[in-house]
């Protein structure tokens, strides 16, 4: 080995040049479509926007969407097809920054900047900032880093003008998707100041009196994602109205509860005045309403917020009567299970703040309260922070399992999934109705109801059904996306941030791992959803409630994530999905033996951990093969059907012929000596009645 080769090895014996090739494999990959302005994104885990085909009028995700909307050189899953370097360079001129519709040319750039890659020597290049992304480009080595500004959690200056150490003066960018990026600037020229100012301005638009980039981004998708979900249509799909449940529009104009949808299902016996009283007894006015009804037993899942019983144990007769209506609506069981997502100690502590939980005694043993021990948003936020430190940038092989265990992330995933399964057992096994709530009913409650519905109803395991599930249980019922994920706000230490929705998607992935053919969508679909949870490219996850999205006119002014997904469905379909009748209700095993860390998502920025398989490309190839095989099977079935029909006709003709022949003999016997007018024996027979 010569000296140059020796220098390329790190302490662990890993070839740095090979690692850089892995990180910049985007130069040898191309994601089935062109990037912005017909230009592909060259980073195989690159920026999270739709890549635009201006000729076809469609948008397909580049690797940015396939492995993540926020992307980096360290790449995520390897999701691209392949093209040689010459083709890539023809499609991506290195003297330009690829732009999305509505994205402005670089507002600021700085040359001679070094990206301090944790897996390679510093890479020198040029950094650009647009109104949507941070874009770093190096020619030698050929390398691109493309990160949507919405994914940034905080931006900090490192070092001072007096700093003498090399690469000690620059900017650190900490992202919401488990990674951090560092750039070293030259001290002369004040390039750091200008880049920092523009990056801060557009990464945190609400803090700088600007709108989200989603209001600038316009693309003519083939599908209208905003039309995926209609509240009344979904309730009718579930069978409403019935004798015991009705579709209620009492919340028109969001007068009853400003974090609920305008339309929801309530017991038929509950009139509108009762709804007002019950809403007044529930936190935030979030009264019990229908999430799902069993098509056969009519057992239901309803959701709400905690009752306002306080330390004095207040009662509300209308609320008690309302819950009795929910019980009585289910003729197969007279018992209502109240699933409180919180640990008991937390529920008791909430009494001091005016909240609390239901008293079983007032329901004459017809209600049972069960505490599911799911911890609050603060515990979950800290757990994810610890996990991010374990996964990026350095991984300790000798302590990997213990480090992951110490984050307690998988413990929380097990607990959430276990709670959802308990709901499923009560609804499906015991045929009983279940009421679910936590404190305010928009975090843990959404996790539990949506997961239980996913396990109970095969419709929600289809590509569009899962979109309906998210729109219904998360968006319309007021999960606070803006607050929980810090959209557009420069306040990374906000204690109200928490990965609640991320945990739901993680739980979905866990179930997919146990039932490979039960889901129409694939893992890439889940990663894409999480990437655009942060990207601010689409209006789907903006703001805290349906009411605010309506006030901001989000449906008219922004694109829906589902528009992009449904216009490029092949990227998100599971080739193993079986459409023939199968087990309708899923019962996954929520134990540590079966629950795994989702490395494709949490570890994708670490080249030592990410999958080297071209999963999306393989999935599309399998879909094509499946369609070919399905076509062959359909043709074979048609041919068999035709042959069977011909055989049946032939047998029928043969039978008729034999019958006619036998009938003719009888006629001849009965008319022996008879002859035709021509003197010949007659061969004409009377019709045979069969």
Task: Go through each PLM region and give its residues.
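Anionic N-terminal interaction surfaces
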Residues: 2, 7-43, 48, 52-128
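Short intrinsically disordered, low-complexity coil segments enriched in acidic
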Residues: 1-2, 80, 179, 497
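Acidic/polar residues in short coil/turn loops that connect beta-strands
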Residues: 130, 175-177
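Phosphoinositide-binding peripheral membrane targeting modules
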Residues: 108, 114-170
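Catalytic activation segment of kinase domains across protein kinase-like and atypical kinase folds
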Residues: 447-468
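A phosphate-binding catalytic loop at a beta-strand-loop-alpha-helix junction
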Residues: 302, 427, 431-454, 508
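Conserved N-terminal structural segment that caps and organizes enzyme catalytic cores in eukaryotes
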Residues: 120, 145-148, 159-171, 179-424, ...
